UniProtKB/Swiss-Prot annotation:
Gene source species: Lampetra fluviatilis (European river lamprey)
Designated name of the protein: Keratin, type 1 cytoskeletal 11
Gly residues biased stretches: 421-440, 450-463
Misc. comment: There are two types of cytoskeletal and microfibrillar keratin, I (acidic) and II (neutral to basic) (40-55 and 56-70 kDa, respectively).
GO molecular function list: structural molecule activity
Source organism phylogeny: Eukaryota, Metazoa, Chordata, Craniata, Vertebrata
Compositional bias per record (Low complexity), positions renumbered to this chain: 464-482
Leader sequence residues: none
Stretch list, region Coil 1A: 95-130
PANTHER family: INTERMEDIATE FILAMENT (PTHR23239), KERATIN, TYPE I CYTOSKELETAL 15-LIKE (PTHR23239:SF344)
Length: 482
């Protein structure tokens, strides 16, 4: 339902403009000598202010003056409560109640739509700011690329260094294995030489024992020769003594004496030949054995000297190889320590970079989740807005139909009741006067509104102004009501 702007002449040049507005509760706050009226500024210097939210209202504060300018915007056909002593209103039927409920719902919807539009704008601004500040497309990763490239270069350098160290370790291990094989070969050769020396020492002991045995035999043969010579000399002496004792029968036994000397000479010759032969044989055998033993001893001594020299050289080579092996082992240990330190450092760096990447991925995931959540909320709000706009369009069509119907009625006549009472008072919503002493409280009701009891006036009687408005002109009549 809509009211066109009409002038209501009369009190203090007061003019009233009625139209469609928001479904709100209006209060006018007056001071001494002013008026309280909804959406109005009474008198000179009157103010108009409002607070919107939760079905909020507009507050108008009147000042001092004789005139009153009233500008009202009706959206709802709610209850108006007057603050006069005898304030009253008109009540309609079920149609008015339904229209009042529809107006209340429409006011709530409009308020909700405005709130959602503001929230939608705020969300759009926040989304734009987030997309500008934290969007994946606008973020600059060039610094990270440089750092990552440097780290890749370092990692490649460390990999090459590890490969070089591993190659050196393998070469050192191969050299150590080669030296170990050489050392084992020399050790086996030394063992064989020592075994040969031990065998030669056994042979030398055997030859020494044989030499000692031969020397004992030579001594025994010499003693036997001396004993035989002594016996021979004794026998010769005995025979000479016998010959001297039997000198008287020399002539008789001369032939036998010759035979005895001959026999003795032959025996002596035989024994001397045997002794000489045995001596020569023994000397030859001894010389042969001594020469063979000397040759063997010389050979063994030469072999022993060569073995000693070889053992000395082998020992010297083994010592040098052992020193080189120790140095290589120390180098391997140091390289292994360096490799372990490098691996630990690379593992720490890799763990740090992995944590940074995970943190950045988490932030990116949270950002995407927040954007998706806000987009979802935006879509929900947009759907709600569309639903509310559809309902508002429906209510607008209903109201336009009601306005057209009421316009036809108001073409003939439209009546309203203005109640003016002195003093302030009037509680509740609507248009209510509540000024101080000596003021005026005005309540305006239309034919489609229902008035309820409100406050109480602080002073005496008031006046009731009943206005009947037509299209062409407007007039009012005033009557006094006790």
């Amino acid at each position: 339902m809509s009211f066109s702007s009409r002038s209501i002449g009369g009190y203090g040049g007061m003019s009233t403009r009625l139209g469609r507005g928001s479904a709100s509760v209006y209060e006018g706050g007056g001071s001494s000598g002013g008026y309280r009226i909804s959406q109005s500024s009474m008198g000179g210097g009157g103010g108009y202010g409002g607070g919107y939210g939760g079905g909020g209202g507009y507050r108008g504060g009147g000042g001092y003056g004789g005139g009153c300018a009233i500008s009202s915007s009706f959206q709802s056909f709610g209850a108006f409560r007057g603050g006069g002593a005898g304030g009253g209103g008109l009540s309609g039927g079920n149609e008015k109640a339904e229209m009042q409920g529809l107006n209340d719902r429409l006011a709530e919807y409009i308020e909700k739509v405005r709130f959602l539009e503001n929230a939608n704008q705020e969300l759009e601004l926040r989304i734009k700011e987030l997309l500008k500040g934290k969007g994946p497309g606008n973020k600059d990763y060039s610094a990270y690329y440089t750092t990552m490239q440097e780290l890749r270069d370092k990692i490649l350098a460390q990999i090459m260094e590890n490969a070089r160290v591993s190659l050196e370790i393998d070469n050192a291990r191969l050299a150590a294995d080669d030296f170990r094989s050489k050392w084992e070969t020399e050790l086996a050769l030394r063992s064989s030489v020592e075994a040969d020396i031990n065998n030669l020492r056994g042979l030398l002991d055997e030859y020494s024992m044989a030499r000692m045995g031969l020397e004992g035999e030579i001594e025994s043969l010499r003693e036997e020769l001396i004993f035989m010579r002594k016996n021979h000399e004794e026998e010769l002496a005995a025979l000479r003594a016998q010959l001297e004792g039997s000198s008287m029968s020399v002539e008789v036994d001369s032939t036998k004496g010759k035979d005895l000397h001959k026999i003795l000479a032959e025996v002596r010759a035989q024994y001397e030949a045997m002794i000489a032969k045995n001596r020569v044989d023994q000397e030859e055998a001894f010389n042969k054995q001594a020469q063979s033993v000397q040759v063997v001893a010389v050979q063994h001594s030469q072999a022993s000297q060569a073995a000693k020299v070889e053992v000395t050289e082998t020992r010297r080579a083994m010592q040098s190889l052992q020193a080189e092996l120790d140095s290589l082992r120390g180098l391997i240990r140091s390289l292994e320590d360096q490799l372990q330190d490098t691996e630990e450092r690379n593992a720490r760096d890799l763990s740090t970079y992995t944590m940074q990447i995970q943190r950045l991925e988490g932030e990116l995931s949270n950002l995407r989740h927040g954007i998706n959540q806000q987009l979802k909320e935006y879509a929900d709000l947009l759907n709600m807005k569309m639903k509310l706009e559809a309902e508002i369009a429906t209510y607008r069509r209903l109201l336009e139909g009601e306005d057209s119907r009421m316009g036809n009625i108001s073409a003939n006549s439209t009546s309203g009741l203005i109640t003016v009472s002195g003093g302030g008072g009037g509680g509740g919503g609507g248009v209510s006067g509540g000024g101080g002493g000596g003021g005026m409280s005005m309540t305006m009701t239309s034919s489609s509104s229902s008035g309820g009891g409100g406050g109480s006036s602080s002073s005496g009687g008031g006046s009731v102004v009943k206005t009947t408005t037509t299209k062409e002109s407007s007039s009012y009549s005033t009557g006094y009501r006790s």
